[in-house]
């Protein structure tokens, strides 16, 4: 049993990215689907698909790279889990961080759902900072 399923998902994505895997499978949950939707919308992954397996299901995340086979370049430069089970990080609407001076994205879980830092500023809500990705 994992103590932090979101950190496990981010680590699987990071490891697949390092070795240029085509896709990576992670156990599914609603919050993981929401995070994948943000990663897809922001252009960090190509696509994701929910696969029913009779239990909780699997999310197959298709990775995204720039260039062709020999000259591939990673789209995801870094991905970091911020709020952890042992140390939660909550921010107000005025304290929402910018990642790499606006180049990266902070993923937050708010009362309005899982959103990016930009969306949270527009909505005027704060919440728990899940991860930074750039």
From Swiss-Prot:
Keywords: Ribonucleoprotein, Ribosomal protein, RNA-binding, rRNA-binding. The keyword Transmembrane does not apply. It comes from the Bacteria. GO terms for molecular function: rRNA binding; structural constituent of ribosome. GO terms for biological process: translation. One of the primary rRNA binding proteins, it binds directly to 16S rRNA central domain where it helps coordinate assembly of the platform of the 30S subunit. Belongs to the universal ribosomal protein uS8 family. This is Small ribosomal subunit protein uS8. It comes from Pseudothermotoga lettingae (strain ATCC BAA-301 / DSM 14385 / NBRC 107922 / TMO). The lineage of its organism: Bacteria, Thermotogati, Thermotogota, Thermotogae, Thermotogales.
């Amino acid at each position: 049993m994992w103590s932090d399923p979101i950190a496990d998902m981010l680590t699987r994505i990071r490891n697949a990215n390092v070795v240029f895997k085509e896709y990576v499978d992670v156990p599914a949950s609603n919050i993981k689907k929401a995070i994948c939707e943000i990663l897809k919308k922001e252009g960090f992954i190509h696509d994701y698909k929910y696969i029913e397996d009779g239990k909780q299901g699997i999310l197959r995340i298709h990775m995204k790279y720039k260039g062709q086979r020999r000259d591939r370049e990673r789209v995801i430069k870094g991905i970091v889990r911020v709020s952890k089970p042992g140390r939660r990080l909550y921010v107000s609407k005025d304290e929402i961080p910018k990642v790499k001076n606006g180049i990266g994205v902070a993923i937050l879980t708010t009362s309005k759902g899982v959103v990016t830092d930009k969306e949270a500023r527009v909505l005027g809500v704060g919440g728990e900072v899940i991860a930074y990705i750039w």
